[in-house]
């Protein structure tokens, strides 16, 4: 757990501009600030995928809305910013979540050549993908995520907010799922 209690609330609420799985009117809105090169972010992302499946089976599709916001820590993860740009370029072609899965699964291989390989594997329009990366089309979008995280007191990823309240308990399936269920009541 990253402890920074300078803020316990999400200052910039979830919106349609966010990359999301589920509806914003869900009983539980989970916002994750993550870094594609950070091992802890990858572990939490994978944990959320498992929990999302379990909650969907138990409570239905519209119970949980999962939102991912970029918080690349370039001082310790030099490829995280470029990976975030690749995810946003994939999002422009409707493949944000598939690219995010791939980036977290292969976070030791985030150099440009690999990013193009992943884009190709996902069936993206490669000339468009490369154009967006070279022109840094998505940098402002990523910076908005970083700025929103900073406004909420975040200094390092990963950080989770459940229904706008920072999650500070243990990072495991049982505790995280219990916190989500409690937040929905």
Predicted ranges, named:
Residues 31-120, 181:
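Structural alpha/beta surface segment adjacent to cysteine/selenocysteine redox centers
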Residues 25-27, 63, 83, 156-157:
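A structure-centric signal for secondary-structure junctions around beta-strands
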Residues 20-25, 58-59, 153:
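Short glycine/proline-enriched loop/turn "hinge" motifs that connect secondary-structure elements
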Residues 4-5, 9-13, 32-34, 45-56, ...:
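C-terminal cap of thioredoxin/glutaredoxin-like
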Residues 10-28:
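A short beta-strand-turn-helix
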Residues 20-21, 110, 167:
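Short clusters of hydrophobic/aromatic residues that line enzyme substrate/ligand-binding pockets
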């Amino acid at each position: 757990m990253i402890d920074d209690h300078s803020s316990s609330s999400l200052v910039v609420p979830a919106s349609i501009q966010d990359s999301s799985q589920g509806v914003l009117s869900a009983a539980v809105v989970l916002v994750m600030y993550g870094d594609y090169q950070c091992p802890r972010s990858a572990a939490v992302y994978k944990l959320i995928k498992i929990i999302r499946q379990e909650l969907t089976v138990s409570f239905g599709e519209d119970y949980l809305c999962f939102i991912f916001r970029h918080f690349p820590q370039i001082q310790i993860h030099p490829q995280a910013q470029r990976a975030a740009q690749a995810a946003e370029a994939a999002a422009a072609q409707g493949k944000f979540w598939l690219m995010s899965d791939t980036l977290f699964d292969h976070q030791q291989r985030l150099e440009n050549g690999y990013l193009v390989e992943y884009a190709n594997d996902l069936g993206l329009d490669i000339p468009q993908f490369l154009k967006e990366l070279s022109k840094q089309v998505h940098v402002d979008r990523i910076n908005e995520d970083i700025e929103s995280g900073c406004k909420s007191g975040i200094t390092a990823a990963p950080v989770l907010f459940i229904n706008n309240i920072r999650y500070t308990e243990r990072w495991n399936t049982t505790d995280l799922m219990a916190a989500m269920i409690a937040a929905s009541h």
